[in-house]
Amino acid sequence: MKSSTFGMLALAAAAKLVSAHATVHAVWINDVDQGEGNSESGYIRSPPSNSPITDVTSKDMTCNVNNKATAKTLEVKAGDKITFEWHHDSRSDSDDIIASSHKGPIMVYMAPTEKGTAGNGWVKIAEDGYTDGTWAVDTLIKNRGKHSVTVPDVAAGEYLFRPEIIALHEGNRQGGAQFYMECVQVKVTSSGSKTLPEGVSIPGAYTATDKGILFDIYNSFDSYPFPGPAVWDGASGSSSSPSASASASAPAATSAAPAPSSFTTIAKQPATSSTEAPSTENTSTTSTIVSTTAAASATAPATPSSTSAIASSAASTNSVPQPSSNAGGAVKEWYQCGGLNYKGSTQCEEGLTCKKWNPYYYQCISA
């Protein structure tokens, strides 16, 4: 499907007056909530704000601006499902997750903790981009900020899992893509049979002119070329019966089941309108996981014959008060201040200027 409709979607996003960034607030293991993890006493190396990284050469690309160990580490074993839960402000049902204008892919990397902290050894274990007119971020919003990966059958030890969103609403100019990532502290307790590859360096895996980073979502296209390395062909985990895990839990038994030979991918759900309000029903559903060996797109970098996408699950969270959006008055840094059909304030806070990136999106940035 051609994506010439994304200009219309950008207009719809502007009409909603949503200019939201995002961070990972929590993690679920085998559908068990591990609680808020984005604090010094938690298990996520969280930044002090939800502002993006835009310089692909910055050391902040590794784990965002707060690459420091936190108090807790989650315990998992091969085959366990790890679900990352993203939000704009809070785990409230009314939270908008991330601006619907922030179209782009979602990827997940992992690395041994010591190497990963230093920016080395990062292995891509999952990716989800653009399929049949739907971006990974669209699916993330629909699923209330959740996407999942399977723990590979790797050696026991401590690892960092690094979920990453690349928002491409300003990707039509060099340096315009926005990167959102955190590092989740995880201990694998099973003794796997697979050796994690050497991996890549982050920063270093991307350049500002990579086809998947300098990418114009407002022009017609059929597919999306993922930046960085291919998904590791050993990324599929294995477990005879994944059990619920908790933070700092007792070591789990070693898995003896062989890992699948192909990657896992999500069965895509129908696309929804950018203006549709997210569901707040107190239900939980998990998307169907299937195997695929489809050939990679000719427009994407060379990858193995099968690819891996991020599985997503929808679940609601407890409702707490949600701050209102800034529809009037001075607009804060990084928030929208103009564009076609935009109805909010066009006056930025002192020291900021309203920068036009494209006809659909103006943003308050440092003067």
Swiss-Prot record:
Any GO BP annotation: cellulose catabolic process
Top-rank EC class of the record's enzyme: oxidoreductase
Entry-linked Gene3D superfamilies: 2.70.50.70
Location of region: Disordered: 37-56, 234-287
Coiled-coil spans in chain: none
Top-level taxonomic group: Eukaryota
Low complexity bias: start-end ranges: 235-262, 270-287
Annotated S-S bridges: 63-183
UniProt record similarity statement: Belongs to the polysaccharide monooxygenase AA9 family.
Name of protein: AA9 family lytic polysaccharide monooxygenase A
